[in-house]
Amino acid sequence: MFPTELFTFPLNMICCVIWIAAVVSLYRNCRSTSFVRFMLSPAATYFSIGLLISICIFIGLTDRRDLTDSWIFTAILFFFQTVLLFVVLRGWKKSPANIVHHKHIRWRFIMMHAGLIIALGSGFWGAPDKQIVRMKAETDKPTNETWYIDGRPSWLPYSITLKAFNILKFSDGSPESFEAKVIIDDKPVSLRVNHPYKKNLVEDIYLSSYDSAAGDDSNYCIIQIVRDPWKYGKVIGIIMLLAGVFLLFINGPEVYRHDD
């Protein structure tokens, strides 16, 4: 497995800056080398996309989600981002055949490609800083002890207490939704499935599970705490990507010519 935990902030940020600087330097100063020419070629684009799609399909078909933490998946995603960054840099040097639409074409290209690299990069470089832990919250028993998926314990700087658990049902008796009423730092909070409580800008608290055998009488529930400082980078990247797609839909495709 790739040692993701070794690259927590600020080391991941430093590595990201060094990577960007290295790619920019190679593009500006070594464009005639075989390596840079390959990275700028359609072959590199097709190869990187093919590798990424192939491993994603393999993970989906085999349910080997542990491979997302492997060296090979990390290397493929890094290679894909590197090719994409070279493409973005080259995009600044391109002009459309119809100069009237120059601004639209450039913004469209930047929004789509830079948006994709920001969204992917936030997930890739921010992975070491993302923390997902779970806790067993019991009725009237404050606790701050949590566990990572591999069983390692950790402790929150605040406590959570379960006060009540309710199951809302349809008229036929089937469950409609689940609700856990908890106390978080002396503040009453209602947790429902897919309706997390936002503790702060980077931390969300989810209702994950409960004692299904006890039903409404469940005296505990499983709570998941997700801390992701890079999530807003993903949101910004996705918004940029969608904006680029919208501009493409509005203005249609254009023909490019190389300026370099």
What are these regions (language model features)?
Residues M1-D260:
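Solvent-exposed, non-transmembrane regions of integral membrane proteins
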